[in-house]
Design a protein with these regions (language model features):
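Anion-binding alpha/beta catalytic cores of soluble intermediary-metabolism enzymes, centered on
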Residues: 1-319
Length: 319
C-alpha cells in the first residue's frame, strides 16, 4: 500500500504538481492540508487530473471532524511547554505544520513534508515540540544536504539545524550522517572540515573538529574519517597527501562535516549553484518520526524526490 504523505502547504502549486506526479507513479497517497475550494481551483488552473477522495485527501484546517482530537493531543504534548488549552485550539486551527505533525503523531499519515513556505526554524520548532528525537540520538537533530552530480554524490552536514554545534553534537551528527549516506548505497568517506588542517590552527572551532576526529577514530574505527582539514584537502587526495600523507581517508571525501551552520549552508548553496547539481533534502536526521522540512526554493521535482525519500524513511521506522 502506498504510504500516506501529509503535505503541509497543500494549496501551493508546486505541491499540487508534485501530487500529480506521485499519484501517476503510484509512489504515495498524498494528504493535502488546505482549503478545499482553493485546492480545487488551482488543480483546474494547472489542468491537473487529480480527484479528491480518489487520488488524494484534504484536511481543511477550518472544518475537519478530527479537530477536537487533534487539539487535545497537541495540548497533551505541550501543556508543560507553556501551551494552554485555548492556545492549543488556536494553533491547531492556524498552523498547518502543527496539523501535519499531528496527522503523523496520531497515525492518520505515515510521513510529513513541510517548509515550501515559511522559515525553516519555525517548522523545526513545531516538529521538536511534537516529536522530539529518537533516544539513541541523544536528543539531537541535524540536517543533511545532498548534491548529486554525474561523477558522484556529495553530502554536507549540517546546513540548517545547529548554529554552532558542540563537540558532542559534531560527533553525533557525523554518526547520523554516516547512517544516512549508507542508506543511499554509498560508502561514507568522511572529512571534518575546518579553516585549519591537521593541527595547524588552535582556534576553538579547529580544536572542536580535531577532538571530534579523535573521538570518532577511537569509538567508531570502522568509519573512514579524517580531520580536521581544509575543504580542498577533503576533495583532493593529491592535496591531502602533500599535507598529511598518513591520512586515514583514501580518495575523495563524499561526506563533509562542517563546524557551524554558516559554513555548511554557504558551502551547500554555493556548490549547488556552481555545479548545477540535483539536490535532495535537506534531510532531517534524528527525529523520532519520518518528517522532513524542505526550503522555499524547492521545485515540484524536488518535492517528489523528498517524498520518495520520506517513504523509504517511513518504511525504515516501522516497528
Amino acid at each position: 500500500n502506498p504510504k500516506r504523505i501529509a503535505f503541509v502547504e497543500g494549496e501551493d502549486m508546486r505541491v499540487l504538481r508534485a501530487t500529480q506526479i506521485l499519484v501517476d507513479e503510484g509512489l504515495a497517497k498524498p494528504i493535502l492540508i488546505g482549503r478545499p475550494l482553493v485546492i480545487e481551483k488551482r488543480i483546474k488552473r494547472l489542468s491537473l487530473r487529480l480527484k479528491e477522495g480518489t487520488d488524494f485527501e484534504i484536511i481543511d484546517p477550518n472544518k475537519d471532524n478530527r479537530y477536537s482530537s487533534y487539539w487535545h493531543a497537541y495540548h497533551q504534548l505541550t501543556e508543560r511547554k507553556g501551551i494552554s488549552p485555548e492556545v492549543a485550539k488556536i494553533l491547531t486551527r492556524t498552523s498547518p505544520t502543527i496539523i501535519g505533525a499531528l496527522t503523523v503523531h496520531l497515525g492518520d499519515a505515515d510521513t510529513m513534508i513541510c517548509g515550501a513556505i515559511g522559515r525553516y526554524h519555525i517548522h523545526l520548532d513545531h516538529i521538536r515540540q511534537i516529536f522530539g528525537s529518537t533516544p539513541e540520538n541523544s536528543n539531537e537533530l541535524a540536517a543533511l544536504g545532498v548534491l548529486i552530480r554525474e561523477d558522484g554524490v556529495l553530502f554536507i552536514c549540517d546546513p540548517y539545524v545547529n548554529p554552532n554545534p558542540s563537540l558532542e553534537q559534531i560527533c553525533q551528527m557525523t554518526l547520523m550522517a554516516v547512517d544516512q549516506v549508507r542508506r543511499f548505497g554509498v560508502t561514507p568517506k568522511v572529512a571534518l572540515v575546518s579553516h585549519s588542517s591537521f593541527g595547524a590552527g588552535m582556534t576553538e572551532s579547529a580544536c572542536k573538529m580535531r577532538q571530534a576526529t579523535a573521538w570518532l577514530h577511537a569509538n567508531v574505527p570502522d568509519i573512514e574519517v579524517e580531520g580536521e582539514m581544509h575543504a580542498d584537502a577533503a576533495l583532493s587526495e593529491v592535496i591531502r597527501q602533500q599535507i598529511f600523507p598518513n591520512s586515514k581517508l583514501q580518495g575523495q571525501a563524499n561526506l563533509l562535516i562542517m563546524p557551524c551552520l554558516d559554513s555548511a549552508n554557504i558551502a551547500f548553496n554555493m556548490a549547488k549553484s556552481l555545479w548545477n547539481a540535483l539536490t535532495v533534502g535537506p534531510i532531517l536526521m534524528g527525529c523520532s518520526k519520518p518528517v522532513h522540512i524542505v526550503t522555499p526554493s524547492v521545485t515540484p521535482r524536488g518535492l517528489v524526490n523528498m517524498a520518495a525519500l520520506a517513504v523509504v524513511d517511513a518504511d525504515s521506522k516501522l516497528v
